[in-house]
Amino acid sequence: MSFSACQTCECCRRGHPAHCHSFDRINFESTGENSVFWEEGSTRSAEPDIFGQFFGQSSFASWTIVQEDAVVNVSGLVEGREELQLLAPLGCGIQTGAGAVLNAAGAQAEDTVVVLGLGGVGLSAVMGARIAGCKTIIGVARNEARLELAMALGATHVVRIDSADVRVVTEGVRAVTHGRGADVTLETTGVPELVAGGIRMTANKGRIVQLGTAPETAVLNLPIHEFMVAGKQYMGVVEGDVVPREFVPKMIEWVKAGRLPLHKIVGFYPAEDFEAAIRDMKSGRTIKPVLLW
């Protein structure tokens, strides 16, 4: 499962459903009239009416009600429950990171890619950059274990954040790139200071891709003239700007071919061990917990 979109707005019609004008309302709000199976006059206590609405991923349910377009039919691509449970996270964080590199940024083999933050989205971006054949892939994080995992997943270099001064990270990236900076910078943390640092460590004509969610009140200050002269591009990207029914099957093929080593970041937990899954995710022991019923 993945996200839903209205299918009628300009973004949807142009093949960008992740930027649907009604994305939040359709995926994260349940106001009755936008719920699946909702009928005028029905109530929560009315039987046998069942209705609901929520994003297809991360619903913590063995059964869930979703819009039809949130479902990706993998019949013929997936064999058995064991394979299906490994692939379960593809429809959100994995496609966000990998899709941002391969689809939104259009990274090429000659590009240098920097990934700020190495959670599920960031590590998926690292794997996506490796699939693209990017010559230099730099992972940036605080956690040493995450940096080691990034190297195992395809990063060519890592920079550890061991200071509150973001300039240290910028200098580290510029040292790896011989002063030039990155062609593609993927910011997955949403930390305003790192966002600003990401822009500085990006090369002229480079792309800065914002994937991490910042506080709603956060503001980014840009030196307008410098930004214009450098020809940099700053773009916000949701869900990798992909069409799930097209991109998820591609990811499945990459997993099977060993190009997207999903097993290195996914961990499985019985549903009754939900709290343990949360603890392991917060501690970094497991990157992508999957609940099993």
Say what each PLM segment does:
Residues 1-71:
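Glycine-rich phosphate/adenylate-binding loop and adjacent beta-alpha elements
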Residues 44-60, 78-103, 116-124:
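A glycine-rich, Thr/Ser-enriched phosphate-binding loop motif common to dinucleotide/cofactor-binding enzymes
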Residues 82-83, 106-112, 180:
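Short helix-loop-beta connector
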Residues 111, 206-207, 232:
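Glycine-centered, small-residue-biased loops immediately flanking beta-strands
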Residues 112-118, 130-197:
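Adenosine-nucleotide cofactor-binding segment
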Residues 196-200, 241-293:
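C-terminal hydrophobic helical "lid"/dimerization subdomain
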Residues 202-204:
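Helix-to-beta-strand junctions that scaffold the AdoMet/dcAdoMet cofactor pocket
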Residues 213-231, 246-250:
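Rossmann-fold NAD(P)-binding glycine/threonine-rich loop
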